[in-house]
Amino acid sequence: MKIISTTFLSILLFVLTNQVFSESKNSKWVNLFNGKDLSGWHNPYSHGEFNVVKGVIELVADKKFFLAHDNQVSDFILQAEIKLPLGKANSGFLFRSQKRENGSMFGYQAEVDGSDRKWSGGLYDEGRRGWIHPKKPIENSYNKKNWKTERQEAFKRNDWNHYKIRCQGEHIQIWVNGVKTTDLKDSTDAKGFIAIQHHGEKGQVYRFRNIKILKL
């Protein structure tokens, strides 16, 4: 039994190592934001302001909007950093997202939650199904099992936070500051846009930096 367990662990380690090596060897990280201007980005909405200040994207608005990258992607690893403003604030990273005819965006969103609810790193379906993980209401058996303290405490409220999103096929994973917060399968959208959100709080400035992608 011990031999079988050792063999299994060796095979598993080999597969995981080979996967990481394969990704790094055959692919290349690409900066979606060059740190100087917003080349490659666009605002599909009729409202919302966006600027680059000292290598940081700053979003300002009095209504919710998303600043979207021009290219659609399917399987990838996305890494980015976000800093929420003080006070009431909420944001997110759209991925594999879609656009309606009026320009509004919808689809998968990695949640950035500035409230005491502490759902940062959850998976939200913006403009469509709503919460996928965790689930409403806040107190329920699913959340008790799948949204434990480590995930709740991963986000640093008044600091920069690192997000990692991995999509391959229907497998979706999200990390916040190195803590895996979402790991599930959903096949609703296989390809779409990357976008960053201002939630619409007047006078609030949302900041993003170090946005890069590795296509799988």
Segment roles from a protein language model:
Residues V20-L216:
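Carbohydrate-interacting regions of secretory-pathway proteins
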Residues M1-K25:
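Bacterial Sec-dependent N-terminal signal peptides
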